[in-house]
Amino acid sequence: IWDKERYLNWMYENLMAIKSVMSDNASIYVHLDWHIVHYVKILMDEIFGEDNFVNDITWKRQTSSGFKGKNAMGKNHDNILLYCKGEDFIHNTQYLPYSDDYIEQRFSHKEIINGKECRFKDAFLGTATTDATIEQLKRDNKIYYTSSGGMRLKVYLNETEGIPLDDVWTDINAVNSQADERVDYATQKPEALLERIIKASSDEG
């Protein structure tokens, strides 16, 4: 087991080497636990610059670790520090699917289009919407009329991408001992976690 000073020296050298080969639009994600994350954050501020700090992502692993008792709470998350090389870094917003309850509450309107039930919500049109735009929306069946005769915009469920991902990730579990993807590596990351990171910070091809 490494002591803290040796680990931080090793981490510093590796981060410097990684930065030297990063492209201008690249990002780096560093997965850490509660023991060391705050120390590594200071290193990364020095190496990449405080202005290039993007997010401290909280990844809830679903299984608690460490002492749990009257003097401590179970530790149920790790941290993923995200830094970019510069202001031109790639960022593709990722989305989470709506829950059934969310759909029921927010997309509460229904209508039949081409024999199929479609859900939608109504949204504010905006004061800058021109008459020409409103007429086009009417032709496209995108105007919802309220009981008082007001006009709102129809936003169909099948035209939305979901809920934009924030910096608290609770939907990806750690790799358990029975998982098909398990390779017996102590700090193995779930494929779903790696896929999310790749999609968020790189373009296809």
Residues covered by each model-derived region:
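Core catalytic lobe of class I
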Residues: I1-G205
